[in-house]
Amino acid sequence: MPKGNKKPNEKKEELEKFAKELQGSDSDEDAVVIEQPTVEPKLPQNDSSSSNKIVLSQAEKDLLRTELDKTEEEISTLKQVLSARQKHAAELKRKLGLTPFSELSQDINRSLKTVTDTDAYQKTAEVAAATSDTVKEKWNDMRNSSLFKSFESKLGSALNNAKMAASTSIDHLAGAARGPSQTGTPVAEEAKPIS
């Protein structure tokens, strides 16, 4: 009989025979054992239904319902256990004095520490410090320049003149408000420059 014309049963028998020969004749530890694949039986399907529903016997339905009930009961039990553990954790936190605010602040502090410990943050802080030092040096150099000192003195004298004018105007208005019945005129005090 040619090889291509063998029936499936004959092929299966030959494979089993070959596997037995391998198991019996080879004593090496690395020998390959060929096992026959297990085939799961297919459940009958109702071909008349367009939704391809699986048809189950009453015993299978009862078994599935029992398993569903057990699973739902386990879920309920786990929810109760979780709730009890959460209450216990809340009680322990209360005894330790941990409030939601303190937990939040601890989380923020931990996050900040994590960020400040990174290389990127360290490098950025170094660059910012160097930039700050450079700006301070430039500012001091500018303040010590003759142009800045000249501008500062002119601005200071203009400010003093404005204060003196405002003071004189207020004194003049105060004198006018007193009226002619009072003897003498108010003497304008000489404004002292603010230094």
Curated annotation (Swiss-Prot):
GO cellular component, one term: cytoplasm
Biased composition (Polar residues): 45-54
Coiled coil: 48-97
UniProt keyword annotations, A-Z: Coiled coil
Record flagged with keyword Coiled coil: yes
Cited InterPro entries: TPD52
Biased composition (Basic and acidic residues): 7-20
S-S pairs: none
Transmembrane domains' residue ranges: none
Location of region: Disordered: 1-54, 173-195
Pfam families reported in the protein's UniProt record: TPD52
Keyword Coiled coil: yes
Family label: Belongs to the TPD52 family.
Name of the protein this chain belongs to: Uncharacterized protein F13E6.1
Organism of derivation: Caenorhabditis elegans
